[in-house]
């Protein structure tokens, strides 16, 4: 069935009222483009941010939506006002599926098209909530979410493997350069490496 995002999810507008000491703080700079995982944040108590989020909330970078910044919060904390906190309505949308609805090209294209402002365009929830998409029944949503999270885990593992491979190749390459720099050549003895 086709639904609007606002029918199955809502913007959370809660503010942090407690002590801020040690509370994670998320700004736009902490949201990596195209990534579902939130891997960096600050732990400052001196922030002016007041918007709060819960573990499992989707944090959407509403300023410059073309940067494709959205991630799942792995903890509760405080975030910038330029982040829209989105939460699933569990009776309509499986919370584990929401990140994949937000972190996709169709949604970002819609958000960019609805953004207002020239230097720093921002998308508002009132517009984002009108994003339409096809949504299966809850039972099928579970299967789909499991499949998408498994694919995401495989993608993350692949990225780590590529980074490790790149590091290994670079260290081997640089090791050869170091040995060559310490080498000397003589007509009788050929190439010799300094000890």
Task: Give residue spans per PLM region.
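A short glycine-rich beta-alpha junction/loop motif
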Residues: 63, 77-84, 117-139
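Sequence-specific dsDNA recognition surfaces
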Residues: 6-55, 192-195
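A structure-centric signal for secondary-structure junctions around beta-strands
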Residues: 20-22, 80, 95, 128
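Non-catalytic DNA-recognition/assembly elements of restriction-modification systems
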Residues: 1-18, 130-146, 153-195
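A short beta-sheet element
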Residues: 50-51, 58-103
